[in-house]
Amino acid sequence: MPLPLMMINYSLLLSLALPPIAGGIIGYFTNDLAIKMLFRPYKPLFLGPYQLPFTPGLIPRNQERLAKRVSDTIMGSLLTPEELQRLARKLLQRERVEGALGWLLQLALKQIREDKQQKTAQILANILRDLFSESLPRLLKALARQDNFLSDQINRIFDQILLEFRLSELQSRQFADWLLGTVLPPDTIRLALVDFLSDRNIQVIDEGFREKTSGTYWVVANLFGVRNSLTRLRAFCLEEKETANLRLKELLLSLEIRNRLKDWLQQLSLENLPVSTVRQLRRTTGEVVRTYIRERGEPLLKDFGSSVDWDNVAVLIVNRLQSSTAVTGSLGLVSEELASILERYLEDDLEKIVKQIIPILAIDQVIINRINETPAAELETAVQAIVRSELQAIVNLGGVLGLIIGGLQTGFFLVSRGF
């Protein structure tokens, strides 16, 4: 084949093949080139004192505005208040909340067990000290002003304890021994007898005995009377003290006063009193207790609070709680109840809470700051990675479109040449 004809064929082949090949290459690499043109150069370039146009790249030059637009788009379309409420409800499902609360309670109990400095005991001691020294006295003072304060409690104690109270046999014997040994010993009875047998009382007894007797007793009363006998008894008690005490003691033994007194004390009960008397006693007991609490309740509690070693009490309580199976066994129930309370609260106020949280979290400002703080090179790398991993079909489509456009140009060329 002659050389000129061969050169014409090569030239024609190149003219036909070059447009599709060039179009495919340009279409394939246009995305990378466009992305690079958006970010490059990262910093402004200067020619002498003049800044070159289109430097820095479009995105670095408008990064703050881009950050604001991205933030507005996300907050306006993606993270709307309704979407945040939906996410909050999903996050705060009862099972998750219950599990989180249970974990927190377990963690708190573990922290208490590992507390070497007894911080928990110190806090509890301060609470107990304030409760019994300040808070309860003030509360008691305020409540004691009510007329029905502790009315039900006092009546219940009176009916269940005081009304049914009886001395046991041992208590009755000890009480009788105390009465006859301390309150009414023979010497005390002798002195009481001497005081009773005064001249006037003896005269009254003698006259009454004379006037109110009849028959044989009248004869004895008017012939002999009782004046001389009572006078001699008084003189005997005054002059023969030890002998009189001994005779009185023998008389008490012979009359079995101790046993009689013990039996009487053992049978003594408020239930044997009339109903009206019991009601009055109940009313009087309540008034006495309330009056005492009004007048002495506050200082009594303060004295009690200041006299107790609350530090030691708090340590004992904390140590007991650490080893208590009731505490560890009730953590699940406590977390369940707390989750139920939180669920009821969130049903009514979740929308209000989300509206209050959004300004506090300032998500839009976080997005703006994060974009502004990210270097342009990192943004470019991230965009390139997304394009290569998720948008590779667009890159391939660019190459195919370039190839098709190049083929169309070749077709127009052939048509224009008359092939």
Swiss-Prot record:
This is UPF0754 thylakoid membrane protein sll0412. The chain crosses the membrane at residues 394-414. It is a single-pass membrane protein. One of its GO terms (cellular component) is plasma membrane-derived thylakoid membrane. Belongs to the UPF0754 family. Its main location: membrane. The lineage of its organism: Bacteria, Bacillati, Cyanobacteriota, Cyanophyceae, Synechococcales. Keywords: Membrane, Signal, Thylakoid, Transmembrane, Transmembrane helix.
